[in-house]
Structures are given as structure tokens and as C-alpha cells.
């Protein structure tokens, strides 16, 4: 089955040609040409974390930001990858019960 996510890639620092090589490798993993052309791909990427850890080690001079927007409305996140390491942030939306007193 699977779950679709919109992945948007941005190079934060490092050689542009290495970044282009990385996006071409990701196109190969996902069997598409979207990422190297548009820096964005809507896909089911089952091994995202393992693949990105491996790729960021293969291209240790670059830092990449990946923004994700999943099928569920509350699935928004961003990851920064550099030399096999990841810094991850997730958006957390408040529940109504947690904020209803702020509306009065």
C-alpha cells in the first residue's frame, strides 16, 4: 500500500555539482526524473531515512534540507542532512481542547 509524501529538496551549502549528483541518485531510487528536474517529488519513499543517511555520507561536503508534506494534514516536517547526520523538526498542531480557553 504505502503513503505519499511531497519531498522538497534545497541545498544549504556545498558544491552544486555534488547536490545534482545526489538528486540524480534519488531519481534512480524512486524510478523518476522529478527530483533532478524540479527539486521536488511526490512519492512513496519507504527507505527515506536509510537512503538519505547513506547519500549524505556519500556527499559529505553538502548540507541538504528536505521539507516533507504527507497525505495527512498534520504531517509536516523538515530534515537537515549532513555527512550521515540528521536534524529533524516536526510541526505539531494544537488540539481544540488545548486551546479552546484561549478563544474566549
Which ranges hold each PLM region?
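Short, extreme N-terminal segment that most often corresponds to the first beta-strand
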Residues: 1-27
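Charged interaction segments
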Residues: 23-104
